[in-house]
């Protein structure tokens, strides 16, 4: 099964991705993990990403997409994968479609975790991370609304909307049930 996870920061994508990965026996591919792995291994893509990050800039789509492409070519992703953090923009979604088309593949579903902004703020503040203050969180939500939310329309027809305001177990169960239909 080939899946993409969408949802605002704090929706629980990382938590749900791990549970889904285990339940479906497919790798959880997170762009954050890809960046860290490529940087720690000193790959060419990792060096490029590090330069942008050191300068406080966003890593360009091309670098991120190339990391994702390389990861999707690994053996454990042959029977499916769960993408978390990519695509984040329409441009990245187009690139992902091209990557899959080259292999005669397509996404099975796009899971969209829906959660209110107030719940997101509450969750993220309770995590106690240094960079999680209300102003920063609301800025991240604004970026999500502008950049990533348009993907919901892009993937219309493949979207599975999941209410992400319950318990971890309930959300996981709802996701697996939606995928079974």
UniProtKB/Swiss-Prot annotation:
Consists of three domains, a large central CORE domain and two small peripheral domains, NMPbind and LID, which undergo movements during catalysis. The LID domain closes over the site of phosphoryl transfer upon ATP binding. Assembling and dissambling the active center during each catalytic cycle provides an effective means to prevent ATP hydrolysis. Pathway: Purine metabolism; AMP biosynthesis via salvage pathway; AMP from ADP: step 1/1. This is Adenylate kinase. Catalyzes the reversible transfer of the terminal phosphate group between ATP and AMP. Plays an important role in cellular energy homeostasis and in adenine nucleotide metabolism. The gene is adk. Residues 126-132 are annotated as: LID. It catalyses: AMP + ATP = 2 ADP. Monomer. Keywords: ATP-binding, Cytoplasm, Kinase, Nucleotide biosynthesis, Nucleotide-binding, Transferase. One of its GO terms (molecular function) is ATP binding. Residues 30-59 are annotated as: NMP. The keyword Cell wall biogenesis/degradation does not apply. Belongs to the adenylate kinase family. It holds the Pfam family ADK. Its main location: cytoplasm. It is found in: Cytoplasm. InterPro entries: Adenyl_kin_sub, Adenylat/UMP-CMP_kin, Adenylat_kinase_CS, P-loop_NTPase. AMP binds at residues 31, 36, 57-59, 85-88, 92, 129, 140. It is an enzyme of class 2 (transferase). GO terms for biological process: AMP salvage. Its EC number is 2.7.4.3. PROSITE patterns: ADENYLATE_KINASE. GO terms for cellular component: cytoplasm.
């Amino acid at each position: 099964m080939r899946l993409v996870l969408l949802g605002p920061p704090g929706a629980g994508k990382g938590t749900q991705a791990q549970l889904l990965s285990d339940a479906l026996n497919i790798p959880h591919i997170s762009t954050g993990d890809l960046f860290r792995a490529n940087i720690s291994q000193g790959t060419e893509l990792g060096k490029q990403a590090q330069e942008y990050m050191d300068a406080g800039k966003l890593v360009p789509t091309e670098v991120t997409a190339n990391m994702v492409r390389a990861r999707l070519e690994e053996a454990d992703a042959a029977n499916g994968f769960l993408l978390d953090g990519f695509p984040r923009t329409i441009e990245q979604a187009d690139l992902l479609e091209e990557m899959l088309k080259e292999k005669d593949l397509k996404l099975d579903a796009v899971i969209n975790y829906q959660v209110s902004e107030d719940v997101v703020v509450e969750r993220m503040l309770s995590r106690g991370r240094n960079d999680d203050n209300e102003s920063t969180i609301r800025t991240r939500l604004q970026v999500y609304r502008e950049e990533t939310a348009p993907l919901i329309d892009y993937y219309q027809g493949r979207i599975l909307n999941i209410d992400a305001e319950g318990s971890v177990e309930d959300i996981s169960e709802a996701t697996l049930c939606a995928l079974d239909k």
